[in-house]
């Protein structure tokens, strides 16, 4: 019998490998992305102090609506970049969370770059 590969388990292993190499500091925090089947979340994290500095998702009250999941991801990217600039954060380290840099993750990253975040 063929065993089915658990994609989320593989993603978590990949994410653990990446997280061992990158971490966010006060001067350059980590932009973390989490993607579920319906929603997308982004957090800017200072790993040294263990604090979330800014966050956004498509479940936020000031999000509005989006036509597609990729469109929602780009709006979340704009929102997290706006909230980061309000707190004086301009430069971050991008943590794609073990996901491929494609689709929703790419849309979020590009929208955040266009709205002033550098990575």
Curated annotation (Swiss-Prot):
<feature type="compositionally biased region" description="Basic residues">
    <location>
        <begin position="9"/>
        <end position="20"/>
    </location>
</feature>
<dbReference type="GO" id="GO:0008097">
    <property type="term" value="F:5S rRNA binding"/>
</dbReference>
<dbReference type="Pfam" id="PF00861">
    <property type="entry name" value="Ribosomal_L18p"/>
</dbReference>
<comment type="similarity">
    <text>Belongs to the universal ribosomal protein uL18 family.</text>
</comment>
<keyword id="KW-0689">Ribosomal protein</keyword>
<dbReference type="InterPro" id="IPR005484">
    <property type="entry name" value="Ribosomal_uL18_bac/euk"/>
</dbReference>
<keyword id="KW-0687">Ribonucleoprotein</keyword>
<feature type="region of interest" description="Disordered">
    <location>
        <begin position="1"/>
        <end position="25"/>
    </location>
</feature>
<dbReference type="GO" id="GO:0022625">
    <property type="term" value="C:cytosolic large ribosomal subunit"/>
</dbReference>
<keyword id="KW-0699">rRNA-binding</keyword>
<protein>
    <recommendedName>
        <fullName>Large ribosomal subunit protein uL18</fullName>
    </recommendedName>
</protein>
<dbReference type="GO" id="GO:0003735">
    <property type="term" value="F:structural constituent of ribosome"/>
</dbReference>
<dbReference type="InterPro" id="IPR004389">
    <property type="entry name" value="Ribosomal_uL18_bac-type"/>
</dbReference>
<comment type="subunit">
    <text>Part of the 50S ribosomal subunit; part of the 5S rRNA/L5/L18/L25 subcomplex. Contacts the 5S and 23S rRNAs.</text>
</comment>
<dbReference type="GO" id="GO:0006412">
    <property type="term" value="P:translation"/>
</dbReference>
<comment type="function">
    <text>This is one of the proteins that bind and probably mediate the attachment of the 5S RNA into the large ribosomal subunit, where it forms part of the central protuberance.</text>
</comment>
<keyword id="KW-0694">RNA-binding</keyword>
